[in-house]
Curated annotation (Swiss-Prot):
This is ATP-dependent dethiobiotin synthetase BioD. Keywords: ATP-binding, Biotin biosynthesis, Cytoplasm, Ligase, Magnesium, Metal-binding, Nucleotide-binding. It is found in: Cytoplasm. The lineage of its organism: Bacteria, Pseudomonadati, Pseudomonadota, Betaproteobacteria, Neisseriales. It comes from Neisseria meningitidis serogroup A / serotype 4A (strain DSM 15465 / Z2491). The keyword Cytoplasm applies.
Length: 215
């Protein structure tokens, strides 16, 4: 594993931040040089909350790249989709700034995990979806799913979008932290999605995030 990977989710609040932190921690433990980035953080002022969570899970302090703003190039105060948060803050989202920051991180680290906002179809600007940006940059995707009710539908829609846009799925991460309280639903979601991943993206990895992994 080497290069830049885009971490997206099948929905909002699916566990992307925790999953990104845990994956980075595991890579660190394997001796990899890894950093996480939150290119667009909304609902914050000066520091990206998600980056702070990543560092806590990774067990490391804020890095020099964090202090330089490379891991959090765009921060908006209103907690909403990037296109709306930017509009309400009265300024445009700077895609060149984001691209440059990611490139600088990629030059310094072996692996860069880029955590997106929400799912693949979230608008970054009025004219650009997250999935458009991923395709433009050529990033493989790490997709976060779960065992909660509705996850099968949302995951298959995400699969269809990735195929339509010709984007490589690196791995599907099944997040047990958001499992349904109904054990039948959670287990069936796991079994079904594991089979569909093999059919739809045979080269993609299946990963599971246990409830204790983020502790």
């Amino acid at each position: 594993m080497k290069g830049v990977y885009f971490v997206s989710g099948i929905d909002t609040d699916i566990g992307k931040t925790i999953a990104t932190g845990v994956l980075a921690k595991q890579l660190l433990q394997q001796g990899k040089s890894v950093i996480t980035q939150k290119p667009v953080q909304t609902g914050c002022q000066n520091i990206a909350d998600d980056i702070a969570v990543h560092r806590k899970i990774m067990g490391i302090p804020m890095q020099e790249a964090d202090k330089q703003g490379l891991t959090m190039p765009e921060i908006f105060s209103y907690p909403a989709s990037p296109h709306l948060a930017a509009r309400l803050d009265g300024r445009a989202l700077d895609l060149d700034k984001i691209r440059t920051a990611t490139q600088q991180l990629a030059a310094q680290y072996e692996i860069v995990l880029v955590e997106g906002a929400g799912g693949l179809m979230v608008p970054l600007t009025e004219n650009l979806l997250t999935i458009d940006y991923i395709r433009q940059q050529g990033y493989p995707v790490i997709l976060i799913t779960s065992g909660r009710l509705g996850s099968i539908n949302h995951t298959l829609l995400s699969f269809a979008a990735l195929k339509q846009y010709g984007i490589r799925l690196h791995s599907l991460v099944f997040n047990h932290i958001h499992d349904s309280r109904d054990a039948h639903v959670a287990q069936d979601s796991l079994n079904y999605l594991k089979c569909r991943l093999k059919d739809s993206f045979p080269e993609a990895e299946w990963l599971e995030l246990a409830k204790t992994d983020a502790v």
